[in-house]
Every structure is written in structure tokens, then in C-alpha cells.
Amino acid sequence: VLSRLLSLQQADAAFPSGSFAFSNGIEGLVAGDPAFDTASLIRTLTGLVRFRWAESDRVALILAHRAAPDPARLGRIDAAVEAAALVEAMRVGSRRNGASLLTTHVRLATPGADELRAAIRSGPMLGHLATVQGALWRALGLSEPEAAAVAGYQLVSGTVSATVRLGQVGAIQGQQALQAVLPLVAEIAERPVPEEPDDAIVLTGFTPLIEIAAMRHARADLRLFAN
């Protein structure tokens, strides 16, 4: 029961993870499509989960969960995340969000958080969000499926929240979109992830519309979110 409660704590929007500052590309999409609605949001969430999170961030998180607290192995997973993130705004955002989450856990005295911060400062690690999540949540006692479920939920709920804050959909419509994609998140969170050697960590993702929108968003004069 404790691990479930800790999972709820980590997934809670009130938990200071720093994710409120990031829209996962949704602000750029909305700016380019005034007709963006609930159906558009569901399609976007589905694409994020199926074509980026499933085989990129989720895989990195699971591998980091297994590797913790080995900083060398975590650093190689971080390097794979860096290589897989083609858009600078998303790449930098991942590191910034990872740093924010880690700072909170350092202040909460989560086991291993100080060592993770030292590994990032000294060089073996870059501190991408998925890597930090996997290492920290293992230290809290979350299982691999629990950690994946929390990360998947944070991705979709954070994207929904950003869309609501942008005024593009209402709160009820946002929750309808969230409900529509949760079964997909649950199914993917339970998929097995094979162990991969350091020289063969493969993270794949293909979300071109979101990535193009994020690149345009990075040059916008007025922005509510960091990406």
C-alpha cells in the first residue's frame, strides 16, 4: 500500500516536480491551429504516448530504475536520451525538468538524491527527466510498472493541464481527453523492457508535428511555457 501512496504523491499535480513550466510542445501546436479542440488534444496525447514515450522516455526510465544507483550506467542512459531528443527545446526542457525534480527530492532527503546531484555536477550524468525519475522512484520503492505508470500519467496530465491553461479546452474537456488515453498509458506501462547493453541502448520516437511546433515555439516572442 505504501508504494501506491508514494506513486500518488509523485503523480500529484501539487508535488513540486517543476513540470508545470513545460507544455510538451502543446503551446506551439495550439498557436499554429486555432481550431485545436478536444479531439485534437486526444490525438496529440495518443501520439505523444505511442510514438515518443512508449519507446523513448519509458524505456530510459525503466533502464534507469534497474541501473540505479550506478552513476556510470545512468550516465550512458542519459546519453541515449540526449541523442534521441532531436529538438533543442525538448532536450533542454528534459534536463531542466530533471533538475527541478531532483532538487525537490534532495530537499525531501530521498535516498540517493544527493549522490545523483553529485553525479550530474561532476559529469557522468546529464540529468534528463526520465533517468532521474527512474533512479529516484526506485529509491522510493516503486516497482518498474508503478514508476512507468506515474511517468506516463504525468506526461498526459501535464499536457492536458497546459492545454487548459492556454484556454484552448475547458477543464471538463481536458478530463475527457485524459480519460480517453489512460487505457493506452496503462497498457504501455506494463510492456516488458529487455535489458540493453551500454553500447546498444536504443530509444526511438517519431512525433514530427509536435517537434516542429516546439521549434517554432522556441522563437516565439510571447510564451507561457518553456517548450
Residue ranges and their predicted role:
Residues 1-227:
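Metal- and O2-centered redox machinery and metal/ROS homeostasis
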